[in-house]
A protein has these predicted regions:
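Second-shell loop/turn segments in exported
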Residues: 111-118, 149-154
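Stable alpha-helical elements in mature extracytoplasmic
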Residues: 29-32, 41, 106, 122, ...
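C-terminal motif of bacterial Sec signal peptides marking the signal peptidase cleavage site
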Residues: 15-18
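The canonical Cys-X-X-Cys-His
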Residues: 33, 39-49, 126, 164, ...
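Glycine-rich, acidic and aromatic/proline-enriched surface loops and short helix-turn segments
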Residues: 128-136
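Flexible coil segments in periplasmic/lumen-exposed cytochrome c-class electron-transfer proteins
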Residues: 20, 47-106, 135-186
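Electrostatic cytochrome c docking/interface patches
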Residues: 21-38, 50-55, 75-76, 116
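Sec-dependent signal peptide recognition
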Residues: 3-10
């Protein structure tokens, strides 16, 4: 009977240890994803800004990675801007909308909101988008426009892209319908 109890105790300990290891692996992946999203500069364009101290824009913690606010104004660019303003591109005050020779691009909602974010995307959609520069990674999808440096992400490892995906799936969903890109004015 003592051997049976020791066996049960050992099984419980091994089960708990296995669960803790699995939990720490998931946590490590989320931490890695958060790190990559942060150093990758995702907040620079995908998080709306509020005015911080000293007039420096700061990320709006209530709208992390929610993209261009749906009712926010956006910049307009004309070919003469290159000569008259010496400007290749213009941006809004939140850095969530950019205009240039490609038209107007808007930082998409990266939160897991199913209606307006990437909640309906799969991990494969995300990794394919980062590798191909096509929205949702669809071969016939629209191009991911400047200033999104998707070409820098295409060289990342599958594990790193999966970690980013896991982190993006873990953040709060924010409903925010980002406008579709606009073609250049002729």
């Amino acid at each position: 009977m003592i051997g049976f109890r020791k066996g049960i105790f050992l099984a419980i300990i091994l089960t708990i240890a296995g669960c803790e290891k699995k939990q720490s692996t998931v946590q490590t992946q989320l931490e890695r994803g958060k790190y990559l999203v942060t150093v990758g500069g995702c907040h620079d364009c995908h998080t709306p800004k509020i005015m911080g101290s000293g007039g420096v824009p700061a990320p709006d913690e209530k709208r992390l990675l929610s993209g261009h606010p749906e009712k926010e104004r956006y910049p307009r660019w004309a070919p003469t801007d290159m000569q008259e303003r010496n400007a290749m591109a213009l941006t809004n005050s939140m850095l969530t909308a950019w205009s240039g020779p490609w038209g107007v691009s808007f930082a998409i909602n990266l939160t897991p909101d199913k209606a307006t974010g990437i909640g309906e995307w799969s991990e494969q959609h995300f990794t394919d988008a980062m590798r191909t520069g096509k929205h949702q990674g669809q071969p016939n999808g629209r191009d991911i426009l400047p200033p999104m440096p998707w070409f820098n992400y295409k060289i990342m490892s599958d594990d790193d892209l999966k970690a980013m995906w896991a982190y993006l799936r873990s953040i709060p969903a924010i409903q925010n319908q980002v406008p579709l890109p606009q073609p250049p004015k002729k």
